[in-house]
């Protein structure tokens, strides 16, 4: 099903993610550091049940991803607190997928659980008379990433796994600066350009902005490792925080002010 969700401002989503981290830190008597212990937060603190399974088989949905790879990576039953993550993301079987797994867990157990479980009853009541087998409240497919319900959960996951304060501190430690980096700062750097070319080749990308993304991801990569997320997830977060800029901000004109 597609869950109908209201608009929520970015800062409200980020505040809730920060509140969850603060609640967890207080309950455990710990200081939050990267990488964020997302499994402990979801399973021990929020007390949600997490399983791995072949989601396409479980939900009886044919595969439609590129090369028939899975395009359903997570599902959550908001009425029972059950999360199923596709077995293709199992970090014990596929260590290279750990970043994607952690983000999916934060997306389901953070984003959907914290933001959307209060919306379940009205939607469930309309389906109850027709459902023989309980279906997940939200099925997360890569093809639906731009839907509001998915965007909100994605943004929540990024705030939860990459908290603003910790990312800014890591940025300063790694780069020795608090100011943002411009795309134009990176292009003359031969080493960075070479690394970007390697990333593009590895990803098999041909989009117009692939080079720019790869340049930013070459900067984001060591920070991503520290936080246990993918290069792309960290690049997006750094751009959202204004630490990576594609164009130089325009100075505000004083015309009409003086």
Set out the residue ranges of the language-model regions.
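Active-site hotspot residues in diverse enzymes, especially metal/ion-binding acidic/histidine motifs
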Residues: 1-258
